[in-house]
Amino acid sequence: MSSMRTHYCGLVTEQFSGQEVALTGWVQRRRDHGGVIFIDLRDREGLVQVVCDPDRPEMFKAAEEIRNEFCIRVTGKVRPRPAGTENANLTSGKIEVLCHELTVLNPSVTPPFQLDDDNLSETTRLTHRVLDLRRPQMQYNLRLRYKVAMEVRKFLDAQGFIDIETPMLGKSTPEGARDYLVPSRVNPGHFFALPQSPQIFKQMLMVSGFDRYYQITKCFRDEDLRADRQPEFTQIDCETSFLTEQEIRDLFEDMMRTVFKNAIDVDLDAKFPVMEFREAMARFGSDKPDLRVKLEFTELTEVMKDVDFKVFSGPANSDNGRVVGLRVPGGGAISRGEIDAYTQFVGIYGAKGLAWIKVNEVAKGRDGLQSPIVKNLHDAAIAEILKRTGAQDGDIIFFGADKAKVVNDSIGALRLKIGHSDFGKANGLFEDAWKPLWVVDFPMFEYDEEDARWVAMHHPFTSPKDEHLEYLETDPGKCLAKAYDMVLNGWEMGGGSVRIFRSDIQSKVFRALKINDEEARAKFGYLLDALQYGAPPHGGLAFGLDRIVTMMAGADSIRDVIAFPKTQRAQDLLTQAPSSVDEKQLRELHIRLRTAEPKPNA
């Protein structure tokens, strides 16, 4: 391999017995057993046991002085381990290396934690990320990330895609998430924006005739962070010309199947199921449903319109209200304390409470039910609830009644919490499997109550369905888009759409968004101009590489599959970024800081 080593530690196996090897790595552990020193030597491929015998005094003296995380080089002979001392958990577990020579390449100060400590806080791990990345799980995660990216490139290259870079410094378009702004020193008072996606550039590449484009690139969004969000993230960005929506979906479904098979030997469905946005929201309250959870909403809005219970009838008679039931088979065993905990949980999502009915005996109707709300419901409503939910003896039915968004968010989250719980898994409410699907036919627009206007659900370059073009000017709320998301186990793996390729339709969409011609020209004139030069029909997808690898690795957060991530406060604890800069730098950029005004006392 090199003049310093002949093999990786973790790849030395019994086939090398009797051979001389040179190994380099870090001391995982040093043990002194009856005058013989054992060293667990670690590199990126794993561990090997090195035996240091006192018969070689100079080498043995060096071995006595080493400590954890010293970087060393050893030479020695591979031999079988004595019978009964093999370690089946290691690739090298049947052999050991009898050390002939040991060199300390670099000592180490005492690490702030043991690398095999699984209870470290994330703050400690991110502050000492260099050491954290030495841990086997992190080594695995980042190598898996490389493998996924490599498999994506292999697939797309074979399909005739061309890897083209697009600019990192672009124009700010204050739509959607906030941009990260970069001041221009040579153009005082002007700013670049880091790209939220290469969306417009890849569309212009299609106009330029490149036909099939991709890049694996960084994108930036200055938004509030969650477990699956970072201010900078990596996107597998793809665009094609002259393909229909179905052909685009088929192509990238095949890509995802290939990547999962080659990267982690998982066979995804031969054909992903397809679900309309409307159906996903009706059944699961989410446009990215986790199909592993075997619980669904039951629509009860109509049933509750005439009940003498304002908690239900109020939302049922409201234009933007919704009432649903969530039947949990066997849920009668859920304790009152657990119900109280679930009530607190749905409150996180804006729910004002959590109504429930335990079904003791269906055949007895009202008398077979246990709940404080039964007295508020007439017999017809109770009968309809039991019928529609398919309730059986021993079940519990939870209810959501509020604005549709609150119901979808709160009962949707409750569905997942119960399904993923020990109770859910023990009662067959969760299937441990890979469950992909396409969600399609998204609305083009959603209404922003605060600004009293329509906003694009995806982005303003998404094409409306051909049969809905008339709604752009008459009723934008009815307009559906040629948009599609690939969902896997409740995570959006990628999303895309067929794009608008005619400038007249693009202008109509801008007008529906209350972006007048002058504003559209100022923000997107270069795209509108490009569309006039025979732009081809085109569309594509963008996949979140971080999310894909997180799912494959079974990691808790995308921060576990990124080498140097930011915290949920968008800070890098290793380098202490972001940081203040000196006055000279600000003057060169023609920037003066404005001190935040103190908030008045309430």
From Swiss-Prot:
Name used for this protein in its record: Aspartate--tRNA(Asp/Asn) ligase
Taxonomic source organism: Cupriavidus taiwanensis (strain DSM 17343 / BCRC 17206 / CCUG 44338 / CIP 107171 / LMG 19424 / R1)
Subunit structure: Homodimer.
Catalytic activity from the UniProt record: tRNA(Asx) + L-aspartate + ATP = L-aspartyl-tRNA(Asx) + AMP + diphosphate
Compartments reported by the entry: Cytoplasm
Biological processes per GO annotation: aspartyl-tRNA aminoacylation
Amino-acid positions noted as binding ATP in the UniProt annotation, renumbered to this chain: R221, D222, E223, Q230, E492, G544, L545, D546, R547
Single GO MF descriptor: aspartate-tRNA ligase activity
Family note: Belongs to the class-II aminoacyl-tRNA synthetase family. Type 1 subfamily.
A GO CC term attached to the entry: cytoplasm
Function noted in UniProt: Aspartyl-tRNA synthetase with relaxed tRNA specificity since it is able to aspartylate not only its cognate tRNA(Asp) but also tRNA(Asn). Reaction proceeds in two steps: L-aspartate is first activated by ATP to form Asp-AMP and then transferred to the acceptor end of tRNA(Asp/Asn).
HAMAP family: Asp_tRNA_synth_type1
